[in-house]
Amino acid sequence: MPAAPKIPFPLSTAPGGNPIEGAGRLINCSAEPIADGRSVRHRQPGLTTFAVTGQTGYRGSLLVNNALFVAFNGRLVKVDAAGVVSDIGALAGTKKVEMARNNLVPTCQVAIVTENGAFLTDASGAAPVAWPDADLPFPNSVCFQDGYFFFGIGDRRVFATGINSSSVDPLCFTTAESKSQDALIRVVAHKGLLFVFTTAGCEVWSDTANPAPGFPYSRLAVLDRGLIAPTALAGWEEGFGNLLWVGDDCGVYRLGAGLQPDKVSPPDLDRLLQKQAKIDPT
């Protein structure tokens, strides 16, 4: 009886442009090279249930001290370390949110940006309210660094609050001006720098302690690759070291040496992202 043919399992996702070209995809497992050119594949068991909120439509979350603040369709809830769920209050909207916290003592503030504007709550779980300072224009993203909340505005402006405060000086802003026909879609704090992503590039700003009411940061570098969608970004969170994002050309990039974007995606993955971008560009 002839021996069964060996099945060549892939080492990464390689579906090919057409099924006949593909080498396969790894789903719920990962490949690891070992000695003598061999490799081993480990099963990835997935996740276990930690808490049940009774809500639907996950929109985003943020760890605040020892509790997880989670936004769902129309609501904001808090999950403590024991998995106990508490309702915080209404948070209108269904789209993804951006959240950040500051270091205000004794109770830090939490900023939330939704499709309906900016909202403010705090670590105690106070019901979210519309941003209390009317000098803040309508933002599309928020992050925190060096004591400041930074808010990104679609017209390429970035506003900074006071130190560990919700106050906004109408003069404390800067504008991403390296490109002329792009739109700002995300601000991210990473490794002591502020990354201002637009649809056509990215500006990197550093803290130069510019005096008030001026913007406290100054531009350090400009990256050639923009961001395809506000949520197409990872690695900036605490516990991660490398910034990864899907660029405006549907390629995946990693922040490399000299603040330059290094492309890390193979052509197969680029094609998958291009197809997805046609279906849902967000």
Question: Which residue stretches match the model-derived regions?
Answer:
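A short loop-to-beta-strand structural motif that recurs across blades of beta-propeller domains
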Residues: 75, 117-119, 201, 251
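Repeated scaffold domains used in trafficking and secretory/extracellular systems
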Residues: 54-62, 92-105, 134-146, 182-186, ...
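Hydrophobic or amphipathic alpha-helical targeting/insertion segments
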Residues: 100-132, 151
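Beta-sheet-dominated scaffold domains
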Residues: 185-282
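Beta-strand initiation motifs
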Residues: 83-87, 125-129, 165-172, 210-218, ...
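A broadly used, surface-exposed interaction patch
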Residues: 79-112
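N-terminal beta-propeller domains
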Residues: 1-85, 138-199, 203-210
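Short linear interaction motifs
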Residues: 44, 50-52, 90-94, 127-136
